[in-house]
């Protein structure tokens, strides 16, 4: 697969390291040498082809041992264990890795409770479950800040960023209440990245927690840790947009990336209801850069579609080429017209893989077709889609030949 990425001309490849591959039990004193060897082999292969790795330390894979013993990230013990793991990664892989992300879609704690936070509601009969979510998120914020600080100490030339789900909502109407509701909704998208960029809880998040009657426990050094561990860049996933309204009564909803919104009558929808919107990417880039004044990195963007192998043995996917073309143009405008500092882009998928949003193989994203069905049956052979050659041309021309 890496050789195929090199054929496309990849300059960067996003990957993640599985915590449990490095420490089979997070409380082990010594890392798993076979796990370290596995990732070293991957990184060396990327280096052979001059592909820069972008490495995520935690991507929806909280070790089960932490869920069982500490109730996931609700237990503060997870901070020290994560830092031990992160330190091991920096020490063993730092020679090959310049760009790091601490947590994938860090805002996902309140959506993907188990995979992102290791939180199981049945384990919490002594504290309101929602309060436990805020506390778990605080522990991840502290862990992220400590990882940034330690990463810079071990790998002085490294760039360590955060990663968020870039949900984008337009007000459904120009009614003031719809605009206010949308503003409040977008605040909830940014609240945790605000901490990672500015090094402190935003006032609106403090008020949100207070107004719910919850208390998030801080240790005495937490505020200083957050201040000292701000990120170098902001990365995000972007797929589509939706609308938002103060009331959805009588309105048609559309599914989206983890959240439903109000359907936008001006946008096309995929088979799965996601409303594709290249202008929304430019809008998001400007919004993010104006807010954070940090370099931006798009680390997930793509189109899920039901690809078919034709009688000629090929996969013709002009719809993916069109999606890519439109989004590259949006990035170009954000850079050249709006002055956004966009430092990188990675397509979601590269090869076909199981769709996280629908749990199926049929929703395919890759430039490379993988012969597997929804039940794991198939030859696992790879086929270059038409979009493979198209993306190769995009990379070679730095987006000028579309």
List the predicted regions and their residue ranges.
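Active-site region of glycoside hydrolase catalytic domains
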Residues: 25-27, 37-402
């Amino acid at each position: 697969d890496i050789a195929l990425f090199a054929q496309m001309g990849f300059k960067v490849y996003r990957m993640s390291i599985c915590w449990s591959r490095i420490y089979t039990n997070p409380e082990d004193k010594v890392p798993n040498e076979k796990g370290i060897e596995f990732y070293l082999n991957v990184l060396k292969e990327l280096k052979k082809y001059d592909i820069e790795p972008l490495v995520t330390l935690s991507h929806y894979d909280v070790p089960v041992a932490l869920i069982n013993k500490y109730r996931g990230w609700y237990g503060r013990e997870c901070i020290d264990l994560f830092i031990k793991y992160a330190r091991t990664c920096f020490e063993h892989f730092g020679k090959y890795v310049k760009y790091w992300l601490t947590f994938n879609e860090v805002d996902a704690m309140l959506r993907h409770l188990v995979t992102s936070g290791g939180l199981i509601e049945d384990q919490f009969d002594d504290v309101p479950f929602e309060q436990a979510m805020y506390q778990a998120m605080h522990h991840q914020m502290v862990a992220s800040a400590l990882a940034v600080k330690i990463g810079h100490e071990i790998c002085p030339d490294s760039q360590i960023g955060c990663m968020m789900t870039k949900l984008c909502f337009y007000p459904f109407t120009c009614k003031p209440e719809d605009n206010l509701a949308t503003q409040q909704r977008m605040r909830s998208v940014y609240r945790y990245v605000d901490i990672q960029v500015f090094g402190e809880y935003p006032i609106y998040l403090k008020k949100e927690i207070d107004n719910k009657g919850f208390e998030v426990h801080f240790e005495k050094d937490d505020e200083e840790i957050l201040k000292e561990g701000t990120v170098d860049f902001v990365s995000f996933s972007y797929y589509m947009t939706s609308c938002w309204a103060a009331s959805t009564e009588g309105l048609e909803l559309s599914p989206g990336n983890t959240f439903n919104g109000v359907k936008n009558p001006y946008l096309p929808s995929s088979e799965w209801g996601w409303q594709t919107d290249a202008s929304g990417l430019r809008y998001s880039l400007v919004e993010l850069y104006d807010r954070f004044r940090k370099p931006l990195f798009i680390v997930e963007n793509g189109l899920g579609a039901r690809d078919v192998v034709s009688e000629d043995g090929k996969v013709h996917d002009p719809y993916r080429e069109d999606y890519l073309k439109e989004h590259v143009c949006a990035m170009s405008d954000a850079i050249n017209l709006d002055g956004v500092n966009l430092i990188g882009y990675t397509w979601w998928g590269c090869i076909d893989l199981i769709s996280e949003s629908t749990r199926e193989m049929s929703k395919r994203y890759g430039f490379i077709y993988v012969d597997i069905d929804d039940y794991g049956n198939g030859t696992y052979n790879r086929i270059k889609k038409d979009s493979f050659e198209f993306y190769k041309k995009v990379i070679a021309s730095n987006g000028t030949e579309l």
